[in-house]
């Protein structure tokens, strides 16, 4: 498995079997990703999108076979305009926008995506990639298990700064339930996790750690450090440095809205 970093730091994963390859995520849709990936493998490439956000999905139409959970179609379409991508790049490169030509940007094509289903298995020849639903960050968020390698690619589903505060995110309570479900479903099948931001590898305990962070939020014991993002006020559950490394030495974190802790907004 090969990790690929994008212009703005997101991490994609190329999984190669004996016959086929899977690319997990495609970042911003600028700079001809397919041309680069084809220097790494000569095998037919299938794309699995972990979710529909601008920094993960916009490069997908360069490829012929793309799978995404349709619950994220509206997110993908909303983030497809060129100005959305340029704004994201500028925000993540200190206000500087590289001198890209207009034809360096991939045109959106969600109508060509295939449905990515919970439990779907891709046979690559000697290796398999399994997609499993883990809604929370978005309603269509998926994780990818490579069982032969005992690796679980978590993407943005569960990491050191899981965003749970925008209109497309689930409540902390619902997210916790989904974490528990995936933890039980995949118990014993992976020994390490891979992320799509900041660091590549994390421990097999990442899901459990984030469940515990959710527990602290739901019991009023979180640190609740104010966090501002694109006009939205949210809170970082556990104190962390500028690289989202927890100050207590723990692993995993969430950034959430006080209005989205409970299902239906009602505390238990």
Task: Mark where each language-model region is.
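Core dinuclear metal-dependent hydrolase active-site scaffold
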Residues: 118-146
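Accessory terminal helices/loops
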Residues: 120, 180-268
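Short active-site segment of divalent metal-dependent hydrolases/proteases
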Residues: 54-55, 140, 159, 200
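Divalent metal-coordination and catalytic microenvironments
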Residues: 15, 25, 37, 51, ...
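Active-site HxH/HxHxD metal-binding segment of metal-dependent hydrolases
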Residues: 30-123, 160, 212-221
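Active-site-proximal loop/helix segments of hydrolase catalytic cores
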Residues: 135-167, 172-173, 180-183
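Conserved beta-strand hairpin/beta-sheet module of binuclear metal-dependent hydrolase folds
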Residues: 1-39, 144-159
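Active-site neighborhood of phospho(di)ester-bond hydrolases with catalytic His/Asp-centered motifs
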Residues: 23-26, 45-55, 67-70, 133-136, ...
């Amino acid at each position: 498995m090969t990790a690929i970093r994008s212009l703005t730091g997101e991490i994609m994963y190329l999984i190669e079997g004996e016959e086929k390859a899977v690319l997990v995520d495609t970042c911003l849709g600028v700079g001809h990703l397919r041309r680069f990936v084809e220097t790494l493998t000569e095998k037919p490439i299938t794309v699995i999108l972990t979710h529909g956000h601008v920094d993960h999905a916009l490069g997908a139409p360069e490829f012929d076979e793309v799978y995404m959970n349709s619950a994220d179609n509206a997110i993908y379409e909303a983030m497809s305009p060129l100005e959305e991508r340029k704004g994201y790049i500028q925000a993540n490169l200190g206000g500087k926008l590289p001198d890209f030509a207009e034809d360096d940007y991939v045109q959106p094509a969600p109508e060509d995506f295939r449905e990515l289903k919970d439990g779907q298995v891709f046979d690559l020849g000697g290796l398999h990639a399994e997609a499993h639903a883990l809604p929370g960050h978005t309603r269509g968020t998926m994780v990818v298990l490579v069982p032969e390698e005992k690796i679980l690619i978590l993407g943005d589903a569960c990491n050191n700064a899981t965003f749970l505060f925008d209109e497309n995110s689930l409540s902390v309570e619902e997210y916790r339930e989904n974490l528990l479900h995936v933890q039980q479903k995949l118990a014993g099948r992976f020994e390490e996790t891979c992320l799509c931001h900041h660091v590549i590898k994390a421990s097999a305990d990442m899901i459990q750690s984030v469940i515990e962070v959710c527990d602290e939020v739901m019991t009023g014991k979180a640190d609740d450090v104010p966090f501002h993002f694109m006009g939205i006020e949210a809170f970082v559950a556990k104190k962390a440095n500028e690289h989202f490394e927890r100050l207590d030495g723990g692993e995993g974190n969430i950034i959430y809205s006080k209005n989205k802790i409970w299902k239906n907004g009602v505390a238990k």
